[in-house]
Amino acid sequence: MSCQQNQQQCQPPPKCPSPKCPPKSPVQCLPPASSGCAPSSGGCGPSSEGGCFLNHHRRHHRCRRQRPNSCDRGSGQQGGGSGCGHGSGGCC
């Protein structure tokens, strides 16, 4: 009797199925961003900055390394003349 009880206790717990636990992906950014930012910028514009903070933060660092002047001034955040527009590279 005790042997059967031990076998029941030693069974591994059921694993979480993949559909219930999907990893975070940029796809979650696209639906809210389609209304406020161009999809070519990765779907992480200023309108969706709250729901897409990680991707926006990562893109911002990458853009600052490439074009520090235009991004730090913020000249391209509204109009986008020097490479930081809504659809240029994720610095909007």
From Swiss-Prot:
What's the miscellaneous note? Belongs to the LCE cluster present on 1q21.
Q: How does it assemble?
A: Interacts with CYSRT1.
Indicate whether Zinc appears among the record's keywords: no
Spell out the family assignment given in the record's similarity comment.
Belongs to the LCE family.
What is the recorded name of this protein? Late cornified envelope protein 3D
Pfam families under this entry? LCE
InterPro entries the record matches: LCE
Q: Which residue ranges are recorded for the region named Disordered? A: 1-46, 63-92
Tissue-level expression: Skin-specific. Expression was readily detected in adult trunk skin, adult arm skin, fetal skin, penal skin, vulva, esophagus and tongue. Not expressed in the cervix, rectum, lung, colon, or placenta.
Keywords of this protein's UniProt record, alphabetized? Keratinization
* Ranges of compositional bias, category Pro residues: 11-25
Function according to Swiss-Prot or TrEMBL: Precursors of the cornified envelope of the stratum corneum.
